[in-house]
Amino acid sequence: MAEERSYFGTDGIRGRVGEAPITPDFVLRLGWAAGRVLAGEGQRKVVIGKDTRLSGYMFESALEAGFAAAGVHSLMLGPMPTPAIAYLTRTLHARAGVVISASHNPHHDNGIKFFGPDGYKLDDATEEAIERLLQDGPPQMVRCEELGRATRINDAVGRYIEFCKGSVQRQIDLRGLRVVVDCAHGATYQAAPAVLAELGADVVVIGNEPDGLNINVDHGSQHPERLCQRVVEASADVGVAFDGDGDRVIMVDRYGRVIDGDGLLYIIATARVARGQVRGAVVGTQMTNLGLEVALQELGLVLERTRVGDRYVLERLLQVGGTLGGESSGHIICLDRTTTGDGLISALQVLEAMVTTGRPLDELVAGMHYYPQRLVNVPVSRGPDVIRLPAVTEAVEEAEHQLGDHGRVLLRPSGTEPLLRVMVEGADEGQVNRLADWLAVTVETAARGAATDPI
């Protein structure tokens, strides 16, 4: 049974800068504790990378000091996409990779997460061992002659650029494609434009002027409005937007319309089927649009659903022996290319499909028809308990009956807020909206100890 954790969540340790545990003294202790655990495995080398947040420099120094005190050497990568750090952990033969990032969150948040030597998330047992050391007391420094050293890897970005270029077929040439890239003022600001330009694309770049405070501000995968506008203004063929740490991507067609992770997953899967390269099921989440499931069935593929979160997508892929999975938000995992969600590599797979078929993005995604989906957030204090209330379960059964085989109902407690998320999906938009509103009222009323009549 897994131990109760004080610090590590599903995606490392994250919070607001200056508030426990995201403080310099804690991060130093974290580096020391991680170093002690990792040094015990015989390899005394880790890589450290970060996104473009101003606080990342402070935490980079704290981690380096902690690892040095534990006798572990640090290879410093500087600002790098999260998936690049996973890749370099493997190729530099490090015992672990450490990422300083809060992904798509604002600059005032930050976090720390670890990759193991294979480029996958650090295993639970190692994280639990680190937590135990954190709770044992202040760091105990090794002897001076045993202190770890820090080395700057000056060609880290170049290594990752070559890796990304190698993820598509050697003959792929993007000449003739005009691509607008939005780097969210984040970690992809160097690598993404360079990769696309070196493959021959005519690249227009926005969101590539990080100042430490503007990461994810009005740019990136969560704010595609400027990208949509720029694609149309520049008469571009396609737009690409990453989030702050580069593990998410969404794309925009030539008409300025957003293609989310579900649509991109469909395009990549279609290309893989054409080349006979699909292995196992495709993995999505509870929130994956039903339209993707139907479209994949037409390709002869099965969609496996798991909990929301890229770590759960990865776990399920490994369980079913699959190579392709992702989330609507743009976390896409191509296990035949890399070990984690990589926005740039995912975008390259889509661009490769455009080049090999000679078809624009809007035509490639046309085979998938999105089902209308409505999400309502209902304020409740105990989401899991409310879901089990008789009035709620009966209402869900009634809604599912009305939707039949052409829709879904999902009630999911928020992991961070006192909310219950009510999602209804179906072929008829009017019916979807009616049922979503009715279920939301039912949940809210039941949570107060009452019930509503069925519609």
Curated annotation (Swiss-Prot):
Name recorded for this polypeptide: Phosphoglucosamine mutase
GO molecular function, one term: phosphoglucosamine mutase activity
HAMAP family per UniProt: GlmM_B
Pfam families linked to this entry: PGM_PMM_I, PGM_PMM_II, PGM_PMM_III, PGM_PMM_IV
Organism of provenance: Halorhodospira halophila (strain DSM 244 / SL1) (Ectothiorhodospira halophila (strain DSM 244 / SL1))
Cofactor(s), names only, from the UniProt record: Mg(2+)
Gene3D superfamilies: Alpha-D-Glucose-1,6-Bisphosphate, subunit A, domain 3, Alpha-D-phosphohexomutase, C-terminal domain
GO terms, biological process: carbohydrate metabolic process; peptidoglycan biosynthetic process; UDP-N-acetylglucosamine biosynthetic process
Modified residues (Phosphoserine): S103
This protein's record includes keyword 4Fe-4S: no
Enzyme class name: isomerase
Enzyme Commission number, as recorded: 5.4.2.10
Note on cofactor: Binds 1 Mg(2+) ion per subunit.
Chain positions recorded as Mg(2+) binding sites: S103, D243, D245, D247
Residue positions of the active site: S103 (phosphoserine intermediate)
Biological role: Catalyzes the conversion of glucosamine-6-phosphate to glucosamine-1-phosphate.
Record GO cellular component, one term: cytosol
PTM description: Activated by phosphorylation.
Keywords tagged on the record: Isomerase, Magnesium, Metal-binding, Phosphoprotein
Reaction equations catalysed: alpha-D-glucosamine 1-phosphate = D-glucosamine 6-phosphate
Family statement: Belongs to the phosphohexose mutase family.
